[in-house]
Every structure is written in C-alpha cells, then in structure tokens.
Swiss-Prot record:
Domain of life: Eukaryota
Protein name in UniProt: Sucrose synthase
Annotated EC: 2.4.1.13
Modified-residue entries (Phosphoserine), positions: 11
GO molecular function: sucrose synthase activity
Function of the molecule: Sucrose-cleaving enzyme that provides UDP-glucose and fructose for various metabolic pathways.
C-alpha cells in the first residue's frame, strides 16, 4: 500500500477512503471519541491528545497510514454530531478541508467556503441560506506570479527580482519604464540621476559608456563635484556616487543590467538609487516615549523596537546619502498619539527628538472628536473610532513638518497599519507593514466566537483593519518565517488569515496568501550598547549592582517587590514581560510552584505588571489577582520574587547579566509570541534561554543548541526540561557555558539592527521600482479594498463606543 501511495497521486478523500476500508474499527474508535466531545472545536494539540488516548495497538495501525498523516496535519476539528470536519494543513500555506460522517463513515471534501459555512453552524445553528458576504482576494492575484516552494516564503523580493528582471530587460522597448523611473527622481526641486537630455534607452546606453570611459581616466577618489558639470552636459545628474570609483561602480551595474539582466545586480543597483529621504513610522496606541513608559498599558516591546529601528535607519540613510554624493538632510518621524494626561511621561509633548539621532523625532498628534481633544489613555482595543480623523490630522501635520510627502510610510500593529494604509493611499507613497502581533492568533477561536469577545476587545473591527492593511500594503516585513507561515505543526500569524469567518459579518475565503511576494523576513536585533555579553567585564555597569541587589535580594516587601529569596546560592530563573494572559507569566509561576525538584534547584524571579499603581487594564488586573492566588496556593515566598515592571532599559541590560552571574536562565513562556525581543536581549547578554515553541522564538533558538523550546500547553514538560538543564549544569558547569556561547553566536549571525536597516532601505527601493514599472500597485484590489473599507470597516469602527472623558 505504501508503494501505491508513492506511485499514484490520490486526493485526500481517496486516500482516506482506502484507509477507512483497511482500518475501519480503529478509525471509528477515534472519531467516536472526538464526536463524544460534543459540539465544538478541537485544536491541533487536543486532536493529538485524543489520538494518544486510544489503545496503543490501534494507534500503531493508524500512525503510518494516510489517516495518521491527516491527523498529524489537522489544525482544527469541528464537531457537529454526527459530522467531524477537519482543516488539514499538509505543509505551511497549503490547506485542504474535509468532513466525515462518524455514523456512516462517509468522507466529503470541502471547499474553503463550505468548510467555513459548516463551522458557522457552531454559532448560528443550521443556516437559513441567506446571502453571506464572502471576501476573496485571490482573483486579483491570479495573473500575478507567485512562488510555490516553502523556501520562497518570506523571500518575496528575491522572487520578484528573478521574475520581473527577465520580463523587463528582454528588448529595447521594455527598457522605457526603467528610463522613466530614473528620470523621475528629484528632491526639493533638484533633479537626480538623469535629466531630459536622455530621451530613449539607446541614448542612455551611449551616455553610460561615455561616462564609463571618462571615469577610467581619473583617480578613483576624485570627488563628484570635479566632473559634475561634464556629466550634466551629457544627461547625468547627482546621485550616482560621491567619487569617481563609486559612480563607476553604479554605472557599470546599470550597464551590466542592460546587457544581461540578473536579479542580484538589479537589487544592488536599486539599493544605490537615492529614493528614501523622509520616512514616517506610525504607532498610535499606548504611551510612546523614551523614558519611564515601559510597563505602562499597551507599552512594551513595540516601543523599544521602533526606537532601535529609527536609530539604525537614520545611520544607514546618512551613510547611503553620503555615498550617493548628496548633501540632503534626511528626516524620520515617529507618529504617535499625543496624550494631554501624560501621567509623568513626555507623551503630552508635540515634538521630541529621539536620543542618539540627529534628524529623527517623535511627532505626537492627539485623538480628536467633535467635542475636542481626547485627553486620557485609551486601550489599543478601543482606538478604532478615532483613526479616520486621526489620519487626516496626521496628513496635515506631516505636510507642515516635511514640506512635502514622505518617501516611505511604515505602519506598526493593527492601528498603525490601517492609518499607514489610509495615508499611503492618500499620498501615493510606498507602504511597509509590520504587524508585531496579529491578535487573531493570540486569542484562539476569537474569529468564530467574536461576538462573545466584542464588548471587551472589538475584534471584528481589528480583524477587518488587519485584513485591509495586509492587502493594501506594498510590502510586509516580519521578524521570522513563523510569523508568516508558522512551522510544520503550527499555523503562522498571517497564515491564520487565509480563510476564516466572523459569523453574521462576513466570510473570508481567501484573505492572504503566504506565498505572496510582498512578504519579506527582516529580523531585528537588540541595542548592542545596552545588551552585551556578561563576560565583557570592562563594559559591565557595576554602578547598578547595589540597585539590582536590592531588587533581587532585599528582605523588604513593598509595591516594588514582594516575596523574598532565602537561598542566594541558587541560580535564578528569570522572566520579564507585560502581565497579560498571552505572555503567560502566571503560567510559568504555576509550573514552578508545582515542580518540587525545580524549586529545590533554582529560585524564580518575575518582572511583570506594575503594583505601584492601580492598573487600568482589565487583563492585567485579572493576572495580578491570579498571581497573588498562586503565591498563596504554592507557598512560594522564600523561593520566588515578584518585581514590578522596570522601565530603565540600561539597568535591565545589566539585570540580565547579573542573572548570568547566578548561572541562571531566561524563560519566555508566552502562549504565542510574534518575535520575541526579550529572547534576543537575553541571548545577546549570554543568558541561556527557554522560550515558547509558538511563534518567533522557535526560529530564533535552535533547540538543544542555542537554547530550548518549551510548549506553553505542557507546562509540566517545560518544568522538567528546566530541571534537566540545571541538573546537567550542576554535574558539568561547562554545559551552561556551552549553551550561553551558542546563543551569542546565533545572535551575531542573524539578529542585528545594522543588517535590518540595510535590508529595509533596499526593499523600499525595489518595491518602489516594481510599483512604477509594473502592475504591482494592484489597482484592482485597491478598488475592492476601498469598498470593503467604506461599507464594512467604517461602520464597525463607528460602533465602538467612544471613551468616557
């Protein structure tokens, strides 16, 4: 039978039919178990748990056949007795749907719309057959090439360059768009690259050869200014380079392209064209400032990410502008919300310079209603009714600040991305999307049961905004492959938007394609002036040690820290995150509390939540209450320390290193983590790290080599893994050093801000170019999106109550 499967291509239903014939009783036993659960949804881990409960003999028969393959690939099972429907994912980005009648053992294949219709019956009961709005973006991309190999996911720009370079350079006529593109560049009224003396591709090639010949006769270091007038006369303007050597390199790159197009040469050349001088970065929600805000509601890793991003980006822009031979001053503006009630932060200040930069600022624009400016903080789940007016106000402020349009607009998170989409649409500017976290993935079943969560989270609005932005944008940056398409066993954040339903609102039969060439993996790093290895003793910030000693070991219990560590000789398990359900800090505390061996080996220190003031965040309040209960239930005082959120990043860097001194470990136990900046920070300091297998950390860490993956759904196993690590370290102290060094090596290879900023600017150039010379601006889909925005999103946003002032 194995040979049969290898030599014949069967549909999923046919393969299951064969297996049903051969293993009828075993399959019936399992499906009956699942059906007995009653009406509802089983996630992948629950389906596998049910499989593991059947007798071993039955399991063995099913494991190697088609049914075992289907079961391992099943991401969810919908139970509506006597039917069980399965969403099967043979590989990332590829989905098949089927349902089985458990009583008759009949298998049916389903289309995405049919599967979603069936799923909706969980909520709506038997459908009345009324028309349901179905969203399908696939027809708009039907004529556009897409890769099919998994290795192409997240490498969109390489695929695009390969495909379109061949198409663009195949004859003289096809070179006109490139010529037009090079002629349209100007800044503040000054023409760049080419002037109107060059009218056609033949003239361009002639001029380039003439310039190449001349540059071969002058010293490489000759400044551009010395031959600028000569070049202007033949049609070349500033922007090719700052000296003869650099200009010659650029000209030869273009000549090579015209002669024999090559995707790598194309990308290199486009990366040299002066295109990006003004960048706008949007992050409206939370308390966006540089000091004393980390740990405030909705204020965490995203703020750190953007500030580090901006510093690296400005450095790279200045470097490129100098190499291009220009004397232009770049601007980067971080657009966030102005908060008149700034509660001890700078969030009430309109313009604030970013530390460590020369030309980058935070520009704050308030939320506004007909009644005036909104003064207080608003949860990220409640910002939706303000954003359309906010976009108009931001456009007005940008015109004043930049005296023109930006060259790139970068959105962050759902609110920043929809504002970025509206601005890019209005201004005709290249748009980049960074999700950070898509809430649909963080809250399982939040689509099908959206009505239950609507009053608290307004997910109908947020999921609609996400869908709009990811389809509108020119390119999407993710930190990891996992964020796009998950892994063999887990669904990616973006992938979860391929097909889903919001019963009563609309049904998404094709929301996003993870193979779309707009996806690019560009991983950030940690600020290496703050986060550096604990072994670099000359750089260690020993002046912080008394304060850190107080935080960790003081016998005083107050609003800053409660519970004490009685045995200071033990290593410390350390974690630091927002105190919310998804970050799962209370989950880690419970794993620790339940495992006597782990408690014997190590202490646990948690930095999360702010006990110094009453939280406005309902989820944080609930997690605080849970934490107090765990301390009492497991009698943790003596082995556990709970520290309020720490906002001094520089001191936090040294705190990681002090944990290294105890030969401890960092644990990131999140239910789901899009990237895992704290994971990178900890590893950059040399701290062995255990992090969730759901999301980005699974990619950052090579399990067993540069750290360890833990499953937040199996806390007992995670605790046992920690026990195993610390027992090995006790027997062999070099084991700790081995994991620490491997973690550092992993960071140096892949996760630095310099690599990130170079990539972002190159992507902007490439997508800007392709948008100009092809149909990559996707005009048809944008018309569809305009209608979706006006008829669906706007009404949903208006339904969210305005915050009480």
């Amino acid at each position: 039978m194995a040979t049969d499967r290898l030599t014949r291509v069967h549909s999923l239903r046919e393969r299951l039919d064969e297996t049903l014939t051969a293993n009828r009783n075993e399959i019936l036993a399992l499906l009956s178990r699942i059906e007995a659960k009653g009406k509802g949804i089983l996630q992948h881990h629950q389906v596998i748990a049910e499989f593991e409960e059947i007798p071993e003999e039955n399991r063995q028969k099913l494991t190697d056949g088609a049914f075992g393959e289907v079961l391992r690939s099943t991401q969810e099972a919908i139970v509506l007795p006597p039917w069980v429907a399965l969403a099967v994912r043979p590989r990332p980005g590829v989905w098949e749907y089927l349902r089985v009648n458990v009583h008759a053992l009949v298998v049916e294949e389903l289309q995405p719309a049919e599967y979603l219709h069936f799923k909706e019956e969980l909520v709506d009961g038997s459908s009345n057959g009324n028309f349901v709005l179905e969203l399908d973006f696939e027809p708009f991309n039907a004529a556009f090439p897409r890769p099919t190999l998994n290795k192409s996911i997240g490498n969109g720009v390489q695929f695009l360059n390969r495909h379109l370079s061949a198409k663009l350079f195949h004859d003289k006529e096809s070179l006109h768009p490139l010529l037009e593109f090079l002629r349209l560049h100007s800044v503040k009224g000054k023409t760049l690259m080419l002037n109107d003396r060059i009218q056609n591709p033949d003239a361009l090639q002639h001029v380039l050869r003439k310039a190449e010949e001349y540059l071969g006769t002058v010293p490489p270091e000759t400044p551009y200014s010395e031959f600028e007038h000569k070049f202007q006369e033949i049609g070349l303007e500033r922007g090719w380079g700052d000296n003869a050597e650099r200009v010659l390199e650029s000209i030869q790159l273009l000549l090579d392209l015209l002669e024999a197009p090559d995707p790598c040469t194309l990308e290199t050349f486009l990366g040299r064209i002066p295109m990006v001088f003004n960048v706008v970065i949007l992050s409206p929600h939370g308390y966006f400032a540089q000091d004393n805000v980390l740990g405030y509601p909705d204020t965490g890793g995203q703020v750190v990410y953007i500030l580090d991003q901006v510093r690296a980006l400005e450095n790279e822009m200045l470097h490129r502008i100098k190499q291009q031979g220009l004397d232009i001053v770049p601007r980067i503006l971080i657009i966030t919300r102005l908060l008149p009630d700034a509660v001890g932060t700078t969030c009430g200040q309109r313009l604030e310079k970013v530390f460590g930069t020369e030309h980058s600022h935070i520009l704050r624009v308030p939320f506004r209603t007909e009644k005036g400016i909104v003064r207080k903080w608003i949860s990220r789940f409640e910002v939706w009714p303000y954003l359309e007016t906010y976009t108009e106000d931001v456009a007005h402020e940008l015109a004043k600040e930049l005296q023109g349009k930006p060259d790139l607009i970068v959105g962050n998170y759902s609110d920043g991305n929809i504002v970025a989409s509206l601005l890019a649409h209005k201004l005709g500017v290249t748009q980049c999307t960074i999700a950070h976290a898509l809430e649909k993935t963080k809250y399982p079943e939040s689509d099908i049961y959206w009505k239950k969560l609507e009053e608290r989270y307004h997910f109908s609005c947020q999921f609609t905004a996400d869908l709009f932005a990811m389809n509108h944008t020119d390119f999407i940056i993710t930190s990891t492959f996992q964020e796009i398409a998950g892994s063999k066993d887990t669904v990616g954040q973006y992938e979860s938007h391929t097909a889903f339903t919001l019963p009563g609102l609309y049904r998404v039969v094709h929301g996003i394609d993870v193979f779309d060439p707009k996806f690019n993996i560009v991983s950030p790093g940690a600020d290496q002036t703050i986060y550096f290895p604990h072994t670099e003793t000359s750089r260690r910030l020993t002046s912080f040690h008394p304060e850190i000693e107080e935080l960790l070991y003081s016998s005083v219990e107050n609003e800053e820290h409660i519970c004490v560590l009685k045995d200071r000789s033990k290593p410390i398990i350390f974690t630091m995150a927002r105190l919310d359900r998804v970050k799962n800090i209370t989950g880690l505390v419970e794993w620790y509390g339940k495992n006597a061996k782990l408690r014997e080996l190590v202490n646990l220190v948690v930095v999360a939540g702010d006990r110094r003031k009453e939280s406005k965040d309902l989820e944080e309040k609930a997690e605080m209450k849970k934490m107090y209960g765990l301390i009492e239930t497991y009698k943790l005082n003596g082995q556990f320390r709970w520290i309020s959120s720490q906002m001094n990043r520089v001191r936090n860097g040294e705190l990681y290193r002090v944990i290294c001194d105890t030969r401890g470990a960092f644990v990131q136990p999140a239910v789901y983590e899009a990237f895992g900046l704290t994971v990178v920070e900890a590893m950059t300091c040399g701290l062995p790290t255990f992090a969730t297998c759901n999301g980005g950390p699974a990619e950052i860490i090579v399990h067993g080599k540069s750290g360890f993956h833990i499953d937040p759904y199996h806390g007992d196993r995670a605790a046992d893994l920690l026990v195993d690590f610390f027992e090995k370290c006790k027997l062999d102290p070099t084991h700790w050093d081995k994991i620490s060094k491997a973690g550092l090596q992993r960071i140096e290879e892949k996760y630095t801000w310099q690599i990130y900023s170079q990539r972002l600017l190159t992507l902007t150039g490439v997508y800007g170019f392709w948008k100009h010379v092809s149909n990559l601006d996707r005009r048809e889909s944008r018309r569809y999106l305009e209608m979706f925005y006006a008829l669906k999103y706007r009404k949903l946003a208006e339904s969210v109550p305005l915050a009480a002032e």
